[in-house]
């Protein structure tokens, strides 16, 4: 743990129920002990399913009429903000926490990060997950990141490209 420059915690896969908070806090405390920053990396593909089910049910019970995409976006934001609060309670300083919320479609990324920027002043790490191969992945990433960066949203970026079959994994570095 001491050799790493930064830790990444995905709140959706550190455990379920009460174990989730305990395991999340344990990682944060290790970061505190080693004076390391943490990126809270929420990913649409690994959201806390208890949170998603609760929000879907709330949408149905209250007849809110929200789409599943809107609910997933809200869940990502809520997960990131709640995890940030837990990280702070676990001893991390505000300046040690970076937030990312990765989705695979540019409009969703823009929506999520605009709302995150409205609700928090934590540094934001931008990037699409599963952006795609080649020119599609580059175009989707450039489109989403360009809009957000032009608005002053985002502190670090990553372009994640899917390698072509048999292709060089380094292509995403060159992007």
Q: What are these regions, as identified by a protein language model?
A:
Residues 1-47, 52-61, 65-68:
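Active-site-proximal beta-alpha core segment in soluble small-molecule metabolic enzymes
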Residues 20, 28, 33, 58-175:
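Catalytic alpha/beta core domains of metabolic enzymes, predominantly
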């Amino acid at each position: 743990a001491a050799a790493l420059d930064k830790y990444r915690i995905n709140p959706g896969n550190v455990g379920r129920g009460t174990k989730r908070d305990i395991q999340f806090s344990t990682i944060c405390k290790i970061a505190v002990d080693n004076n390391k920053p943490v990126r809270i990396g929420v990913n649409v593909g690994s959201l806390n399913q208890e949170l998603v089910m609760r929000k879907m049910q709330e949408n149905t019970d209250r007849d809110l009429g929200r789409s599943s995409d809107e609910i997933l976006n809200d869940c990502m934001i809520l997960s990131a903000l709640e995890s940030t609060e837990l990280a702070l309670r676990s001893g991390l300083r505000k300046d040690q926490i970076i937030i990312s919320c990765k989705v695979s479609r540019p409009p969703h990324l823009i929506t999520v990060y605009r709302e995150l920027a409205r609700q928090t002043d934590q540094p934001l790490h931008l990037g699409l997950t599963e952006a795609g191969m080649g020119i599609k992945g580059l175009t989707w990433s450039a489109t989403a990141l360009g809009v957000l960066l032009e608005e002053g949203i985002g502190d670090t970026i990553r372009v994640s490209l899917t390698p072509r079959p048999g292709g060089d994994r380094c292509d995403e570095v060159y992007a």
